Amino acid sequence: GPSTDLVIGNKGFDGGIDSAILR
């Protein structure tokens, strides 16, 4: 997704914490 991951610091699929879990 367009949101930046808060943990990894890269573009996430969902954004925020959710992205970190998916990655």
Curated annotation (Swiss-Prot):
| Cofactor(s) this protein cannot do without | Cu cation
What the record notes about the co-factor is: Binds 4 Cu cations per monomer.
Q: What is recorded on activity versus pH? A: Optimum pH is 3.0 with ABTS as substrate, activity decreases sharply as pH increases, and no activity is seen at pH 7.0. Optimum pH is 4.0 with syringic acid as substrate, 5.0 with caffeic acid, syringaldazine, vanillic acid or catechol as substrate, and 6.0 with levodihydroxyphenylalanine as substrate. Inactive after 3 hours incubation at pH 2.0, retains 20% of its activity after 24 hours at pH 3.0 and 90% of its activity after 24 hours at pH 9.0.
The record's catalysed reaction(s) read: 4 hydroquinone + O2 = 4 benzosemiquinone + 2 H2O
Q: Name one GO biological process term.
A: lignin catabolic process
EC number(s) per entry: 1.10.3.2
Where is this protein primarily located? Answer: secreted
Task: Tell me what the record says about temperature and activity.
Answer: Optimum temperature is 60 degrees Celsius. Shows 50% of its maximal activity at 20 degrees Celsius. Has a half-life of 53 minutes at 50 degrees Celsius, 23 minutes at 60 degrees Celsius, and less than 2 minutes at 70 degrees Celsius.
Task: Report the domain of life of the source organism.
Answer: Eukaryota
Name the UniProt record assigns to this protein: Laccase-1
